[in-house]
Amino acid sequence: MLFADIIIDISVKSLDRPFQYRVPDPLQADAVIGALVDIPFGKGNRTVQGYIIGLSDQAKFDIRRTKDIIAVVKQGVVAQSHLLSLAYWIKTHYGGTMNDAIKAVMPVRREIQIKEKKRVIPIPTREDLRKIREELAGKHQTARVRIIDALLQAEDYADGMDYDVLCKAHKATLSVLRAMQDKGWIRIEVSRSYRNPYHTLHAADKEVILNEQQQKAVTQICGNMDAGQQQVYLLHGVTGSGKTEVYMQCIEHVIRSGRQAIVLIPEIALTFQTVQRFYARFGDRVSVMHSRLSAGERYDQFERAQTGEIDIMIGPRSALFTPFERLGIIVMDEEHESSYQSENVPKYHAREVAVQRAKMLGASVLLGSATPSLEAYYHTTTGEYTRIELTERAGGASLPRVEIVDLREELAAKNFSIFSRSLTAKIQKRLE
């Protein structure tokens, strides 16, 4: 007999504890840790949902009073056990309920309609199908003849035709196709189709030569990873010092070793050009998560990560919980940005959670900034983080000249604009 410890999907402090339910025999194969289930709850046995956080063959209470799970919700991304452990850490570290924490680490838990791709594949040889076509033409079975004609004219006969194209362009119907399938003339293949908002991007890699400081940073980080040393690095580099290329070289090293990477970028900085740069290097092994994606696109990207179809996830704070099991590195660009602090319960900071998740999986964390946060910089002085400096701009470019302006003098000169007189003059000169 199998029993499940379940956290109820209700964010109330009085219910913030596991409830034990019995798992009926037909549901035991699907009742895994992290699964979402329907259960009877309370005196009225109203149906609510909850998350399985533990399984046991021992009953904690009177078995006669233990209720049965109604159903396992099969559709949805199942939370991995280490993510549930991370949720518990978030709850104890930042407050809130366990349900709040689970929802934070499962940003795409809601059910989404799965998108399928169908193809109609001819079974007989092309010559045999032509004979079948002639026989059907003699019987005036025009619908079947029309479908066979389309299959015979397909560019790749063995690969058949797309189901939707066949239905729309050649007026095929499901009933006719099923009848032809029953005859053994065709088969309808159904496969999972993922919504990929960046499917038009292609890899176009070009070799980048690192300067001495960049190469030293990559060698240090990758060397420590190869030695099995899990560390947190603060890459303190001036603007234009080539921090992104250091990220990419380290990620490439991680991917070659069979592991995966998460790249956190503030939403405001997550531009098409940024995404294109990663696609140019890593191709379709990259996926992106951001708020502008539809619910279906978000769900599909997390499922692609869970099935191992991708190795790199790029996105803002929520991408931190990508269900990677072989996580090798978490990169956090512009780590000083305030958007990494959650404004909703639990009010976690992505930097601290990234470090905790990396500890759980033996991964490294690479923080990058030209103006590091006080917290990150302090950790480098205590030895908790390793600071790496990039003081030169990549490609030999010179640093911009900085001029300090005293705004009190601007006010004294009756200049109440947000622009100083010096800046205004230089803008006008540039426009001329």
Where are these regions (language model features)?
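Short intrinsically disordered coil segments
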Residues: 21, 67-70, 404-405, 418-423
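Internal, well-ordered alpha-helical segments in soluble enzyme and binding-protein domains
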Residues: 217, 350, 376, 419-423
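Interdomain hinge/linker at the junction between the two RecA-like core domains of SF2 helicases
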Residues: 376-418
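Flexible loop/turn segments at secondary-structure boundaries
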Residues: 242, 374-376
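Accessory, non-ATPase domains that flank or precede helicase/AAA+ motor cores in DNA-metabolism machines
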Residues: 1-369, 381-397, 431
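Conserved interdomain hinge at the start of the Helicase C-terminal
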Residues: 251-252, 407-432
